[in-house]
Amino acid sequence: MTDDRSTDERRTADRDFEVDLDDVLDDEDDDEGLFDDLLSGEPIFENKEVLRPSYTPHELPHRNDQINNMATILVAALRGETPSNILIYGKTGTGKTASAKFVSQELEKTSKKYDVPCEVEYINCEVTDTQYRVLAQLANTFIDQNRAFVDARIADLSDLRAQADDDPNALEIGGSPGDDRTGNESSEGSDVSDSFSDLRERFDSVAEIDDRIDSLEADKAEMEQVPMTGWPTDRVYATFFDAVDYVERVAVIMLDEIDKLVEKSGDDTLYNLSRMNSELDNSRVSIIGISNDLKFTDFLDPRVKSSLGEEEIVFPPYDANQLRDILQHRSDVAFKADALSDDVLPLCAAFAAQEHGDARRALDLLRTAGELAERDQAENVTEDHVRRAQDKIELDRVVEVVRTLPTQSKLVLYAILLLEDNGVHNVNTGEVYNIYKTLCDELDADVLTQRRVTDLISELDMLGIVNAVVVSKGRYGRTKEISLSVPVEETEAVLEADSRLSDIEDITPFVQARFENN
């Protein structure tokens, strides 16, 4: 009996446990997690990615003339000829890069259609900003393509060899790509150029096929990737040269922000790239340079300037109506139906038109407004979201500009901020200089002359961080009255995030120094 009761008790306990477990699971289902509430709202975006700068649209409103001009120049590549080099100018957000990428995609698509070996390699010179890095990136790209080509060629030859083992007459038909070294599609589906598939070579024996395979494998073994540092530049260039010339191709090299490369590394890269065609045997190279600075060629060697700037295309700023058209095209894809109130696109276009017709700014503004609306779990994007987005973007811009200022400019700005933060407004250059000198002494930094500090204040004024106005003091002459144009709290946080400026603890003595020379 004792054992039976124990069994019954265990069964009852098991049933009780099952009920309790079910209750726990029900409670967990009812309990909303961190993201459940955020996901409960109706999404506003259909495809947010089309509003990002990295997206290349299928249509570029108001840029047909520039696109057709580029296509007219680059069509030479599809005839196996060397296209003229192109320099593209225009301010930020005028569609330069998007248009060039659009034309490049069309060029590569058409080259595949007609089996012409042509490819476009894009380099952002704001990131890849030295001759070594540019040449290394290009060399490694072409080395990868050449390895894929060799693998495809070896696979074809191996197939032919297998056929010859079964039937010696197979050698009479040919069946392998030949020594005219142009690419093919590899057995793995890797797209190397299709143009060599019609070129054949004849083999008299299986031994000749084996020799050809050995030769290709030796080629591949010599295709060494360039490390991102450590080699002499002339070795990097030689590796790039051999890689681009290994197969027959027209290579269009697109250098975005080309002025940043020249500014940091000089024009040696452009000199080498623009003059290498005279030494190439199999390939041809063309350059597309994209710049925000219409005057950057003034700093080039005359020989580089003449060969690089064979064709020039200028992208003018968009006006408000054109920006509205661009926003309409993108918003149709980016947002759910009826997600935007009627005044959103005109307001985004108007704000961006004030920023020299910057389409990138307009798209960024529209995307940010949509994100703010989603965070509010609003049903629509409204004018208020656009205005808040404008404030947020402007603050983000200021933070980034301040963060990247040179140390001396930060010290000058910090001196102005300390005065404003302690109730001293519309200060003059002398007052700022007194505080600046004290800060330099505190941090053991070099002290610039007052004339140089005045220049730094003018630079901060041009960046929109301070407002410096020349005012007349009558018989005392003229002076600059300086005030902050950015939020004090956010600016102070960015400056104090600098490891050197964060060492300053007590600001009171610095403000008091303002009165020492009065």
Swiss-Prot record:
Q: What happens when the gene is disrupted?
A: Not essential for normal growth.
Single GO MF annotation: ATP hydrolysis activity
Biased amino acid composition, Low complexity: 186-196
Q: Does the keyword ATP-binding apply?
A: yes
* Native species: Halobacterium salinarum (strain ATCC 700922 / JCM 11081 / NRC-1)
Keywords, alphabetical: ATP-binding, DNA replication, Nucleotide-binding
Locate the residues binding ATP.
94-98, 318, 330
- This one is known as ORC1-type DNA replication protein 7
| InterPro entries, A to Z | AAA+_ATPase (IPR003593), AAA_16 (IPR041664), Cdc6_C (IPR015163), Cdc6_lid (IPR055237), ORC1/CDC6 (IPR050311), Orc1/Cdc6_arc (IPR014277), P-loop_NTPase (IPR027417), WH-like_DNA-bd_sf (IPR036388)
The gene behind this protein is orc7
| Similarity comment | Belongs to the CDC6/cdc18 family.
Query: According to the UniProt record, where is the region Disordered?
Result: 165-196
Q: Which NCBIfam families match?
A: orc1/cdc6 family replication initiation protein
Task: Cite the Gene3D superfamilies for this sequence.
Answer: 1.10.8.60, P-loop containing nucleotide triphosphate hydrolases (3.40.50.300), Winged helix-like DNA-binding domain superfamily/Winged helix DNA-binding domain (1.10.10.10)
